[in-house]
């Protein structure tokens, strides 16, 4: 079941959904607009060996000047918000307005466990350079 925006607000108020920080104007008719935090990690090794656990990353700090994301690269980011619930399964879905720019925000693991409350990891890939 997908909750309406008004039900999301109600459940946040009752403490059944955790969104911190919660900004009421980010509530949509059936979702909440999460935000990308200022720090990204770019995986800089090629090829990536999943048997190893010591991958090399380049840290990127996003500023008002922007940063150009490049195709063929994988960037890891986090949501600003901690999101979760002890009562509902959380689903993190990208916005169509972002998708139309050729940005994929959540490639895997879009379903959260009941009881988990955390900043979500976002896997960012672009199909064209995007600032």
Listing of model-derived features with the role each one plays in the protein:
Residues 1-131:
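DUTPase catalytic domain/fold
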């Amino acid at each position: 079941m997908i909750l309406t925006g008004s039900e999301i607000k109600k459940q946040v108020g009752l403490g059944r959904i955790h969104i911190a920080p919660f900004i009421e104007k980010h509530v949509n008719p059936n979702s909440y607009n999460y935000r990308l935090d200022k720090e990204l990690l770019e995986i800089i090794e090629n090829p990536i060996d999943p048997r190893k656990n010591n991958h090399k990353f380049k840290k990127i700090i996003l500023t008002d000047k922007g940063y150009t994301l490049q195709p063929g690269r994988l960037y890891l980011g986090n949501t600003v918000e901690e999101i979760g619930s002890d009562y509902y399964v959380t689903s993190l879905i990208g916005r169509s307005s972002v998708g139309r720019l050729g940005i994929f925000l959540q490639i895997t693991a879009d379903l959260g466990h009941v009881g988990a409350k955390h900043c979500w990891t976002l896997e960012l890939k672009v199909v064209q350079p995007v600032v």
